[in-house]
């Protein structure tokens, strides 16, 4: 009967040890993926597997010779070691805390005993803390980032808005400049206030953007916006006006072409007079290009300076019965230069 019970205990212990080995091998396969991050854990698991495998042949030999110490050895080394290795860290720490509290209450806290207990622990049990690290080692960093974002949002909510415009500017800066600032739309009312400020400050070429902004007193209006609008206004006033108001009717300014250049009609009408005669030009109006100057009439020479040369050719021979008069005046056509005068 005793041998039968010993065989049953041996089989159960061997089966249990085999289950421990399988569980440890499965854990080693899981850790092998992270062997660079967890080299010590992998080493500990392999050492435990090798220790269990060494225990199996010893158990068989001891069982053959009928030594009962094998059960004590297995339960003393293989079983508790593996159980302690696979247990969760929280349970072990909780037990230690309970023991410490019990010692503190009863005043049995002995530093010598504590040092002895620490020395009796094996090295791999001391380093088992690496195995029970949290699954998310970066979790504290993530929590810290979340706390920073929450505090930043709270500070943004608590930040008061001063004069409206500065608050909007502060919000735009906090957004990180991802979106461009919306351009200001100058309404007619805002432009009238701008013109009123220019009138009081001495005109667009005297007033500065800062003075204009302070005079207008508009929330959210910046110096850059006033400066941009002032530059556009100066360019607009510098351009020549196309329409001149005349009793409520707009009259288009006329231009004439003189020598390939566009000249206003007012400047062209006050031209110089040459040779005592005033040059006048008649203009013809077109619907698209305005007025254009007609070519000036040819200037005729005065009678005092003009002396036409007349050449008289008398006919010779029996066939010529008249006199040919030739005029060399450039104003006469070729058909009227030669006149035949018959002899009476």
UniProtKB/Swiss-Prot annotation:
PROSITE patterns: HTH_MYB (PS51294). Residues 269-291 have a biased composition (Low complexity). Residues 95-104 have a biased composition (Acidic residues). Residues 88-184, 269-322 are annotated as: Disordered. Plants over-expressing display increased susceptibility in primary root shortening under low phosphate conditions. InterPro entries: Homeodomain-like_sf, HRS1-like, Myb_dom, Myb_dom_plants, SANT/Myb. Disruption phenotype: No visible phenotype under normal growth conditions. GO terms for molecular function: DNA binding; DNA-binding transcription factor activity; DNA-binding transcription repressor activity. PANTHER family: MYB FAMILY TRANSCRIPTION FACTOR, TRANSCRIPTION FACTOR HRS1. GO terms for biological process: cellular response to hypoxia; cellular response to nitrogen compound; cellular response to phosphate starvation; negative regulation of abscisic acid-activated signaling pathway; primary root development; regulation of DNA-templated transcription; regulation of response to nutrient levels. GO terms for cellular component: nucleus. Residues 178-238 form the HTH myb-type domain. Transcription factor involved in nitrate and phosphate signaling in roots. Integrates nitrate and phosphate starvation responses and adaptation of root architecture depending on nutrient availabilities. Acts downstream of the nitrate sensor and transporter NPF6.3/NRT1.1. Represses primary root development in response to phosphate deficiency conditions, only when nitrate is present. Involved in the modulation of primary root and root hair growth in phosphate-deprived environment. It comes from Arabidopsis thaliana. This is Transcription factor HRS1. Expressed in the root hair region and root hair cells.
